[in-house]
Amino acid sequence: MNLKDKIDQKIFHLVGEAADAVGQPCYIVGGYVRDIFLHRPSNDIDFVTVGSGIGLAEALAGKLGPKTRLAVYRNYGTAQLRYRGLELEFVGARKESYHRESRNPIVEDGTLDDDQKRRDFTVNALAIAVNADNFGELVDPFGGLDDMRRRIIRTPLDPDVTFSDDPLRMMRAVRFATQLDFEILPETFDAITRNRERIAIITRERIAVELEKIICSPRPSMGFVLLEKCGLLELIFPELHALKGAETKDGRGHKDNFLHTMQVLDSVAEKSDKEWLRWAALFHDIAKPVTKQYDQQHGWTFYNHNFVGKKMIPGIFKRMKLPMNEKMKYVQKLVELHMRPIALVEEEVTDSAVRRLLFDAGDDIDDLMILCEADITSKNPEKVKRFLSNYQEVRRKLVEIEEKDRIRNFQPPIDGDEIMRIFGLSPCREVGDIKERLKNAILDGDIPNEREAAYKLMLKVAAEMGLKQVEE
């Protein structure tokens, strides 16, 4: 098959001319070729040449002119450059062999055939020639094009060898299946299950990268369900695995919290591309297994699972090498607060409760509401309808009170420094108590969020404490 019409762009002709000039066969390989057939945009282009990848890149840079910036990585035998928004990478064809204790291969110079054999999956083992004499010719020794048409993920060689040599490929198989909505061939999936313990030699950082790509996919639950089925999830994310299953006692059961979490995750993904909102969906019930109890009166309960879940998150993030920064705190915040709107819809929606929710959620209130609405997964359509209707009332109240009271991220009109100055105080408990009284009075609607009202209340509270004003 010839694909010259698919690659009829100036850059490919320039690379081909440079390859001819140095006397080396050169091919476009990897994801860019795959994405041509899947009609997916891509700005990253990998080239393999039989010979020196660095030498070819240097020849191309010479053709492009003195302003071209070439990055050379001699230890890896690769070179990179940018061209009109495209990221180009060049490497010489290689063959690889592995030691069992490491995923880092022993690398030797090889042929195009050797290079294609070392690829993870057939859909990534396609190559398109760019030399003048065979420009556009597709090289597909493992039936990758047919696998794309069949929408399957399959390894070019024995999958047991492929996954044992580089266990990260097990995560990549799940990730590609999720991103592309492909099926992992049963023989390939069975090999993942057999080799799952080999994931232990992969660094947590590399696993985290794959998990992030899964969670950013259009239907992220697909990836986590596959990880659960093959046994990888229990090894890399045991807390999520622990959600699986529904227990019954005295004829009373609870929902499978793993499947529920998957529904919530997909529902959030339909409404938002925010990666860390999706992580919050994944974590929102993470503490249910450790808070689960049964009593005759109430059946199954998970009291305080939102607070316990918040406390679990830093340890999980640290172990999984997820960012221990504001992103983690955001996830903690949504996990802690995700029960609050539910409590509101089950009771009368009071202004005071809405003010406190606005204050605690701040700028993340909209994300919190997306998560909470996704959390309604009852099989009872009337219950779902009722809850969603109540949520609309909560949203209406949020807008109304936000416009009226400016509560989101508010600070009381009088701060601690002013309180200390007015009453001649150093930092002390009384200052904090006055600030707390002012905050609660505003949130409870006892006084408006205005300086004059806050000032009067401050004087009253201070007088009750026996404090005297030293400055007007």
Which residues does each PLM region occupy?
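Catalytic cores of the polymerase beta-like nucleotidyltransferase superfamily
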Residues: M1-E472
